[in-house]
Amino acid sequence: MSPLLLWLGLMLCVSGLQAGDEEEHKCFLEGENLTLTCPYNIMLYSLSLKAWQRVRSHGSPETLVLTNTRKADFNVARAGKYLLEDYPTESVVKVTVTGLQRQDVGLYQCVVYLSPDNVIILRQRIRLAWCQGKPVMVIVLTCGFILNKGLVFSVLFVFLCKAGPKVLQPSKTSKVQGVSEKQ
């Protein structure tokens, strides 16, 4: 095996180990909604409170929405545009943020809320970022789609023109078959 392949494999393994420490980045446009799920250990946290928090650079995270019930089947909490749905039987928390605005840019986390100073982060933190290039990307993809279709039809047209009258003339075998069928 070549040293280059070994080196690439090692780099892939190392980068995979570091990925758990990184944040998940999501970009949004004004007015969009964000929905994500946070799985948790059913044996440990099914009856614990859950929360959605904004992480500040200094000080404690700000709790935006917190469940206040510990039912075994379903717990829900709403605070403004934040909705938290806890499904203990499925061991997952569903977070929905409606009507995202520019001021929502920042770092967030989904947690098991044991106390204000004691939380357990359920998944990678989410960094919300403002998307400015998304409309441009839609235009580029649309133009690419149109150009691609134009290219396909141009090639098809060239092949049909090269085939010329051969395509339009009936073949000799069909005339012979037609005569034998009449007899």
Swiss-Prot record:
Induction and repression of expression: Induced by lipopolysaccharide (LPS). Interferon gamma (IFNG) decreases expression.
Domain Ig-like V-type: 30-128
GO cellular-component term (any): plasma membrane
Known function: Forms a receptor signaling complex with TYROBP/DAP12 which mediates activation of macrophages as part of the innate immune response.
Organismal lineage: Eukaryota, Metazoa, Chordata, Craniata, Vertebrata
Keyword Metal-binding: no
Signal peptide span: 1-19
Residues bearing glycans: 33
Annotated protein name in UniProt: Triggering receptor expressed on myeloid cells 3
UniProt keyword list: Cell membrane, Disulfide bond, Glycoprotein, Immunoglobulin domain, Membrane, Receptor, Signal, Transmembrane, Transmembrane helix
Protein's membrane topology: Single-pass type I membrane protein
